[in-house]
């Protein structure tokens, strides 16, 4: 049975997808079999956009599991939080369906890197947040952060939330995306 590692971030657009793809590639280079999974994807149709990015970084084609929908059991067209996207499409997100997909992947691969949607506290369904899901499944976490304004606060709050809930944080990955405002970097006293 493979090891499942959950990858989440301090916010949306913090670079979780890039970090997930890079970590998957690193594990592959170490000789491990690895698959990435997207818990829920909003803002696209059919194959989850984030999986396409993962596969490009990994240097592989879409997998059989991608084409079967196992690596992203829920895809919604409207770009918003998962619970709202599901509501707009009159669908219900069930944790058991995601868990079943993850378990099937873990039977085949050494590592399953399960990427969340948005930040830790985003509701993935009407009843629960991503943090609830991580805690319920006792997944270890890689937290992705960045250098954007407010990230120190968001990172510390996220780590505190994990500590309070007994979630094991394997590492904090700093992602250089988005890039710093060049004016602030070159002339920090200009503002």
Curated annotation (Swiss-Prot):
Belongs to the dethiobiotin synthetase family. InterPro entries: DTB_synth_BioD, P-loop_NTPase. ATP binds at residues 13-18, 50, 115-118. Catalyzes a mechanistically unusual reaction, the ATP-dependent insertion of CO2 between the N7 and N8 nitrogen atoms of 7,8-diaminopelargonic acid (DAPA, also called 7,8-diammoniononanoate) to form a ureido ring. It is an enzyme of class 6 (ligase). It catalyses: (7R,8S)-7,8-diammoniononanoate + CO2 + ATP = (4R,5S)-dethiobiotin + ADP + phosphate + 3 H(+). The active site is at 38. Substrate binds at residue 42. The gene is bioD2. Keywords: ATP-binding, Biotin biosynthesis, Cytoplasm, Ligase, Magnesium, Metal-binding, Nucleotide-binding. GO terms for molecular function: ATP binding; dethiobiotin synthase activity; magnesium ion binding. One of its GO terms (biological process) is biotin biosynthetic process. Its cofactor is Mg(2+). This is ATP-dependent dethiobiotin synthetase BioD 2. SUPFAM superfamilies: P-loop containing nucleoside triphosphate hydrolases. Pathway: Cofactor biosynthesis; biotin biosynthesis; biotin from 7,8-diaminononanoate: step 1/2. GO terms for cellular component: cytosol. Homodimer. Mg(2+) binds at residues 17, 50, 115. It is found in: Cytoplasm. Its EC number is 6.3.3.3. Its main location: cytoplasm. CDD domains: DTBS. It comes from the Bacteria.
